[in-house]
């Protein structure tokens, strides 16, 4: 189990070549990632997902807060790191490797590395073993690194934008391989993606970070049910936002079209319906949100990409 | 042992990722070994002059070690490599020492191997030569051993040089966050560290101490590895200490490395103290190169200082930034001047009291002047004398009458005191610094004193120290020496027989 408690991370752009500014990448993040789950990191660009992953894997030194992996600190701890494999969002660093070379490289670090898994998966994905990875397509490089990550047989596999560059068919195949390999041995998969549908499909838990702050975290089903869309109609006049707010509901978004008012409200469906029923209306309909809609409305409520999202 | 095996496994894993470098460095050193080994022995084409190419290939093979350092420490230069390497199951100590070991496999070992092979081949070849066979049969083991040791010293020079360069490379890699900065700062720092001790000795101690000192080996113990071979009296044990210091520096840099994480990767220089230190050392080096052309040196150094800042900071240029950097340069130059001024006021930080720098035994001081009106002091191992220009015809040394060490010291103390008592002024300082140099203010009244050392140089030449004193100070010194009874008046000298000049 990974316990992240009150983690704050600041990048100080000081020293030679720095402009002296400070960027708060993460602010007071607290999350628990249980064993054996598939955990998705959601967030806008620059939200802090990769920073949190790097802290999880001991790439960055922790400044404030604690991160415990099975009760142990990660930073500078070889035994904890031997249970983690991190695949970052770039592949340029592997350009000079062949896939076989990559196997040898990681094999010298991970004692649990399985040649059997490696060769089986390489064969399954039909990747050439002795060709330089610089000649691989982006998708092939991704597959190669994921294979090595799976063959390292670690308890935690951390994938940052791991499915970028994969075509839909290959995306599905890699996802199947990952879930088969990881879930068979009860390992924990942590992945970040901008593709919310992917997170929705793969993960059983997720978190959303925006500008370094945690918006929500928990089980996907609960996240989906933490907000809902309500359509209200009143024949004589449209229901106003003020009327709704008087009932005590937390409105994320309000819009009208003629006499129909559409509101995105934070909270459980039953509770919302109970409160809204106090407002005189002719029709009141509750529509569950998808994860993608929750993501968009939560960010929109925080002013992220307001214009673009409104247009869409 | 288990820990070493683990680190070794990691180091081999790292080494395997640098196959191109391994091939290149071994080709360079292999051909260097070939040229040095076959020189004038088996192939007529390989004339002795070709040997220089052997040394050259070895030098290039050594210098490119910086590339190996940059490659091995690439986790500090790029966030992508940091992601890979810092997430691997290693503590920072394991990661650092596995990198040092990888550096050994990549660069240090090939230099030691090919250098060692060259030494073995040369030794065997020499021992098979007619000259060696002659000494072998006559049992002159000293000669036989001397040549072998000489090649061993060369081998140690290879080792000391490669370790020095790689240690400086590691220092820069750990303090920089980009490849380019690690590269050029390594060469700047290696150059400054190599020449700066000598320049400090020449400029701060020798010039302001008013003398030339004997090369103090301990002073150059670390950085003189490149030139050690040219000094046959550079002790072998100092080369070993030299290697030891380089290894110690590499090990100590762990304490800086362990403080770094991926957050500083990609920053040109992660350690401000390091940056300012190197820049100060570079300015000090440049301004100590040649005292007689200070204006040109100041300009060239200033331009280089500005260019390095522009490259390193990678910022959008503005007049304000350039003004700030020029201001920093002015402060640095001022510090260099203050350092020189402190040395001037303290007579080379007390270096004046190290005359003669070697043992008094057999030392003699000769004071001469090329001015027709000048008088001079002659201090021999057993006495002191004053003579004037008319005595230029005088050649050789007068057979000294024994003079006690105590009297020698008394005489030397008087010389030291007069050297230290020279009048100080800004004009004199700037003139001697090289900032003022005109016919009008050139010091015509300086008199050269030469201290002959007992010790001889590499080619058995007499080692000397040159001191300078104003004419009036020389006269005062001569009078004091005469008053103290340590020397006799020059008229007496001129008419006395040589055998009795240096009585007492």
Give the predicted meaning of each segment.
Chain A
Residues 2, 9-204, 208-210:
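ABC transporter nucleotide-binding domains
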Residues 5, 12, 34, 65, ...:
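A structural detector for beta-sheet-dominated domains
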Residues 74, 100, 196, 237-238, ...:
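Alpha-helix N-cap/helix-start and coil->helix boundary motif
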Residues 98, 219, 287-290:
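Short loop/turn segments at beta->alpha junctions
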Residues 174-267:
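ABC transporter nucleotide-binding domain
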Residues 259-312:
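C-terminal coupling/interaction segments
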